[in-house]
């Protein structure tokens, strides 16, 4: 059980009381692009938000909150197994075609990985969409992940960084087919940056059950795509942090950045996050 953000305060999501000169499109502004799939990741510039709602980057938020010591995204299965050869204690997590990779400890499923399995562990994560985009967005100045569960935190982070260019990259299915949930997430983040409500947000989220998430409701698919994953991954604004990719001699490493770390209390004021207890 943890206490997480349910509704981020307005001062984090609007331009009021902040350095606002470049946040609105059309005003000597932040250029916000929505890109698609692996090719979009390769084209990403500026601050890149690599989006994979179902399920890679929703899962990484849950793993972080459950106490993972370190998250290392890798592109290939060979890289993942090489990690295990160097360090037998690592946990291998990921999928190909949605299913758990042979030889891995867990699949890409937030509902099936308990906190006790990940607490204090180094996790090597490889998927067919999300981690592919993250590792291939090499022309971006900075890379963070995005999903519905931390979308408002992503918008707040972007505002604090105030880059000239933002690339919202929708990774889709296997990085080659567009997915409505990733586009919805990108448009939601953009709407927060522009202070413009996204029309039909609730209805579009609900409609994912019949579109991008329909396989989570197939009784014959529950081993690979449990229904619980859909509900966990489509919660909005659950976590008040972002995951930023940094690089060291071992490769990419995801760094947790809490909203409270973005700037001082004097700059942001003393407003508190409204929270409620949420089971993760």
Where are these regions (language model features)?
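Short, Lys/Arg-enriched N-terminal segments with co-localized hydrophobic residues
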Residues: 10-29
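A short alpha/beta connector and helix-capping loop motif
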Residues: 57-78, 84-91, 96
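Short acidic, Gly/Ser-rich segments with clustered Asp/Glu that frequently serve as metal-coordination loops
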Residues: 39-41, 48-62
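Hydrophobic, aromatic-enriched interface-forming segments
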Residues: 154, 164-178, 185-186
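Long, charged alpha-helical interface segments
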Residues: 87, 105-142, 156, 161, ...
